[in-house]
Amino acid sequence: MIDIKLLEQLCLCNGISGDEGNVRNLIINEIKDCADDIKTDNLGNLIVFKKGKKSAKSKLMVSAHMDEVGLMVTDITSDGYLKFDEVGGIDRRVLPGKRVCVGRNGLNGVIGVKPIHLTNGDEKTAVPKMNDMYIDIGAESREDALKYVNYGDGINFEGDFKINGKTFVTKALDDRFGCYVLINLIKSEPEYDMYFTFVVQEEVGLRGARPAAFTVNPDFALVIESTTAADVAEVDASHQVCNLSKGATVTVMDRATVYDKEMISAAFELAEKNNIAVQYKRAVAGGNDSGAIHQSRGGVRTLAVSLPSRYIHAPSTAANLDDCESVLKLVKVLSDYIAGGNLAKGKTV
């Protein structure tokens, strides 16, 4: 069973790229009594060692990123409105009218844009540019705003966690669900010794994963992610990357990584053997920390296992609880299989 309370805590914890401290502290608090070693590196990555029942025959690193997409204050107008830019890739179409939390104190604000009745021609239907939007915090002047916020302050989307049957909607599922999976594995009794990395700044260029992988120096890596589903209205089946309620998603190739073929085969064989729902990601698109990890040192054999998610990189993301279970079960059996030495070290295919 998925621990809904913990997953909700992780998703609603604010932590855009470069400001992951609250998320890291939450994770440490969850694992401090069951992890054998916990270190935080200079960039903010959390590197955890968990002793298993047996010594590992292959060194495995299981990884997820702590950061979420968001915004950052870049300027403050003379009349107290905040100008901003994106932190990570965000669909601008969904921003106007969204409620946000500004700075570490979580000051409430709302994203505004020129009122529709004052627009003309193509302006009425055009997607607003970042420069044309602002955040209203109720300040009356720049001086007034500076009492509460400063240049460079992070801006998080205000979120909640709602469940409707097997479907749930929340913010920051990318990649707090991955963090949830790692926490679950650390709390369990793995068959073999394993390393776990909760990394920073994935959304702005895979920046934390490289030093984390360099430090651990694994033979194999599993990256736990969320990936776009696109199984929505008006999208032809041939363009649906993966589907909700169809299980864990395994990627063959994306814009940053060509994944290890033996690891892919092992994932599907173990899924069939253990009656775990699994599907292929049916598009070459996007990327994740695998892109940095697999190039570390002399190379790391890597696979990404993802949760199908609708409306990813937006203030609200939808996913399926059965898929969550499938990802968790697959990662558990696959991690024990790899750490147990069932795949030869080095490239064999």
Report the location of each language-model feature.
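N-terminal hydrophobic/helix-forming segments and targeting peptides
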Residues: M1-V349
